[in-house]
Amino acid sequence: MTCSIESAANGTSRNRLVWIVLCSLALLAWIPTVQQSVQMPLIPGTMGMRLGAFLLFWAVMMVAMMLPAFAPTLSFHLNVAGQQTPRSFISVRIALILSGYLCIWLLFGLPVFWLAQLSAYLAYAAPQNAIYFGMALLLCAGLYQFTPLAAYCLACCNPKLTTHAHMHKAPDYHKYSPVHDLRSGVLHGLYCLGACGGFMLILIPFGLMSLFWMIVITLVIFCEKVWQHGQTLSYLVASGLIFLSLLAWAIPSLLPGLHLG
């Protein structure tokens, strides 16, 4: 009984630490994200940023938008895998898992950069084609959410939708291993990308610097990952994206990120 109570107390302590760390990092990341959004004009593409500067901005933006939604999964992971981990190592494990997780989102910034560059080229060279490009992004993002892959990835990101069987298959799961923590972070990053990557792509037609859409996407992703009806929410949002993609054909101004202003 005493061991059970102590284990529960340790689990609560770990959960609290995870939420404090991730939400604090996200809050700090929102400061430069908001500043950048307010200072830079909403124009097509990467707002003049080259690849290095864009990836730096993208990394900060991902910390702001994604970490609160990752807290439940990381808490679950540490509660299952960290029972025999000394308390002094918990912070180290959080840092290692986050490193692997954020690496995936940083790499995802590469195709986003090139797609944004393409959208800018089309906006200048063929404005009507730019609108079609934006419509295609919205349509693909919406349709993808109805695929089995998206549903599976979301289930792996929401502790209320899955048993997290993929975690328990990991070798030496109850032994502390920096390599395993990095691997787990990468794995969770891939699942998260599979569940939410499409939502990030819609920032291109809506504007990569659109603070409004950043907040909307952040809230949608957070609710998807902490709510027991997250899958239903995903379908509803996806339906809305499909509708917007069709509506944009008649009202191109719905895609401000593809207009020269």
What are the residue ranges of the model-derived segments?
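Juxtamembrane boundary at the C-terminal end of a transmembrane helix
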Residues: L246-G261
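Alpha-helical transmembrane segments and their helix-start/interface "positive-inside/aromatic belt" motifs
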Residues: A9-C23, R93
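Alpha-helical transmembrane segments of multi-pass membrane proteins
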Residues: S24-M40
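Generic transmembrane alpha-helix signature in multi-pass membrane proteins
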Residues: V60, S184-L190, G197-P205
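A small-residue-rich subset of transmembrane alpha-helices
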Residues: R87-Q117, A195-L244
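Alpha-helical multi-pass membrane helix bundles of inner-membrane/thylakoid proteins
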Residues: T2-R14, V38-L51, Y121-L137, L143-L190, ...
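Juxtamembrane transmembrane-helix termini in multi-pass membrane transport proteins
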Residues: A8, L55-L102
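C-terminal ends of transmembrane helices
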Residues: L74-G82, F146-A151, V220-Q228
